[in-house]
């Protein structure tokens, strides 16, 4: 059936999904120019019975017809953005649950990652759905004008908080590598939460001018009906303060951390090789009178000793953690750099650049940046066994780890065995001390007998005494 985009047209065969557009684009408007309606170059539409629109437009296309032409494209955009929103919210909720419930994950770095997950989750709840709504309305602001400044404020706040968290993680790990004793002494849970509060305070301070000035002057947050930052000075300064400066600090400290870990690994290997050369030593144990032989015992310390393994293991764990964080840093930089670079280009080459092209690039790049909030939980799942196990249990609604029977047996029996072994060691120590005291008494008695025999034997009688060794 053919449908003409005119005022007096009968639209009986249009699907309900096209008729119920609400306040969005309609098939016709009252202000449609009559001369355009009377023109012979009308646009023909063919709609089949399966609610699938076959568009065959001929001649002049009024704006209302163009809006329907782009309807299918908007549906695909809405579908993709919905997938990103669901992944962002669900994945970051799993991260928050894992750090809150798993004791293995409760350390300073994972507290930062949990706070980062909170920022990403709020971005998915409060910012992304509104951004998807603007796409469906042709990047026009469909909500009350006062909410525009609030929405931009939340967008800048959570995006800035993400980069600030990554910068703080990089700095914290660098300090931990450089001063491990000082860091371990003062790196309590309270200190970690104070650092997180400082990160959020900085993020709020950077983004606060947006609602302060945007609510007073709509021209700073509106441009041609679209909700976006229109103040070039704030765009330029905010991009450097909220992204490029923290990015520089994060990259420098990360590479310094990698360099320090490599240096420590080299020193540890050389130290182990030095210990291997001085691997043997001997000592003389105590002996009783019944056994006067001297025993020698040699203990050989190999490079794989417990102390060496512990040092190498700690360095290996740090390297693995830096690898995972490096992937998170890299993905964040790759996904947000195009947006901020294009944002600065829009200010610098405002006259020479094509505004339509710049605007289209910004609309695409901002969603690529949003995608970074969804990929972090995937990175944790791929590269961290504890996160992977926790996520798998949470999806199955199992919030506590189920221990196997063998683990329960070991948990119940090992403390008793340890107690018995400690009691045995204490008994052995007491017995050895009693033997040593008895040995000393025997030695003193022998010495006293020797002295008395020497006093009584004044004649030319030679007395042969046994040599007694008490070591």
From Swiss-Prot:
The UniProt record lists the keyword Cytoplasm: no
Organism: Rattus norvegicus (Rat)
Transmembrane segments annotated in the record for this chain: 81-97, 112-137, 147-171, 192-215, 233-258, 323-348, 357-382
Keywords: Behavior, Cell membrane, Cell projection, Cytoplasmic vesicle, Disulfide bond, G-protein coupled receptor, Glycoprotein, Membrane, Phosphoprotein, Receptor, Synapse, Transducer, Transmembrane, Transmembrane helix
Protein name from the UniProt record: 5-hydroxytryptamine receptor 2A
Gene transcribed to yield this protein: Htr2a
Phosphoserine PTM sites in chain numbering: 280
Site entry: Hydrophobic barrier that decreases the speed of ligand binding and dissociation: 229
Sites where the protein binds serotonin: 155, 343
Taxonomic path: Eukaryota, Metazoa, Chordata, Craniata, Vertebrata
SMART domains to which the protein is assigned, alphabetical: 7TM_GPCR_Srsx (SM01381)
Protein's UniProt keywords contain Lipoprotein: no
Matches recorded under SUPFAM superfamilies: Family A G protein-coupled receptor-like (SSF81321)
Disulfide bond sites: 148-227, 349-353
């Amino acid at each position: 059936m053919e449908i003409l985009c005119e005022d007096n047209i009968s639209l009986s065969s249009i699907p309900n999904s096209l008729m119920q557009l609400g306040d969005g684009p309609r098939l016709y408007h009252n202000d449609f120019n009559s001369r355009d309606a009377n023109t012979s170059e009308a646009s023909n539409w063919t709609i089949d019975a399966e609610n699938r629109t076959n568009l065959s437009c001929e001649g002049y296309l009024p704006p209302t017809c163009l809006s329907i032409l782009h309807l299918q494209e908007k549906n695909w955009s809405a579908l993709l953005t919905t997938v990103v929103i669901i992944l962002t919210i669900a994945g970051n909720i799993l991260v928050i649950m894992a750090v809150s419930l798993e004791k293995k994950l409760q350390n300073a770095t994972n507290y930062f990652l949990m706070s980062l997950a909170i920022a990403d989750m709020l971005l998915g709840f409060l910012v992304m759905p509104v951004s998807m709504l603007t796409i469906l309305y042709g990047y026009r602001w469909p909500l009350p004008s006062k909410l525009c400044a609030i929405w931009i404020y939340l967008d800048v706040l959570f995006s800035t908080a993400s980069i600030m968290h990554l910068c703080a993680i990089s700095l914290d790990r660098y300090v931990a590598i450089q001063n491990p004793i000082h860091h371990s002494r003062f790196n309590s849970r309270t200190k970690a939460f104070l650092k997180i509060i400082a990160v959020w305070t900085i993020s709020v301070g950077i983004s606060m001018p947006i609602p302060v000035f945007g609510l007073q002057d709509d021209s700073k947050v509106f441009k041609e009906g679209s909700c976006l930052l229109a103040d070039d000075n704030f765009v330029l300064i905010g991009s450097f303060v909220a992204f490029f400066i923290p990015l520089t600090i994060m990259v420098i400290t990360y590479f310094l951390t990698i360099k320090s870990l490599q240096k420590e690994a080299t020193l540890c290997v050389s130290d182990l090789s030095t210990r291997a050369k001085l691997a043997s030593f001997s000592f003389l144990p105590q002996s009783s009178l019944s056994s006067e032989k001297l025993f020698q015992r040699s203990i050989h310390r190999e490079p794989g000793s417990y102390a060496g393994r512990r040092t190498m293991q700690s360095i290996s764990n740090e390297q693995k953690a830096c690898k995972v964080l490096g992937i998170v840093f890299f993905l964040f930089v790759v996904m947000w750099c195009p947006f901020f670079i294009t944002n600065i280009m829009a200010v610098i080459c405002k006259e020479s650049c094509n505004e339509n092209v710049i605007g289209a690039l910004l609309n695409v790049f901002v969603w690529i940046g949003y995608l970074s909030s969804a990929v972090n939980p995937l990175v944790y799942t791929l590269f961290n066994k504890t996160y992977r196990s926790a996520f798998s249990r949470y999806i199955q609604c199992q919030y506590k780890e189920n221990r196997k029977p063998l683990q329960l047996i070991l948990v119940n029996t090992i403390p008793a065995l340890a107690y018995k072994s400690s009691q045995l060691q204490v008994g052995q120590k007491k017995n050895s001390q009693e033997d040593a005291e008895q040995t000393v008494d025997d030695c003193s008695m022998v010495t006293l007998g020797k002295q008395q025999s020497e006093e009584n034997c004044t004649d030319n009688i030679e007395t042969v005494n046994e040599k007694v060794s008490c070591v």
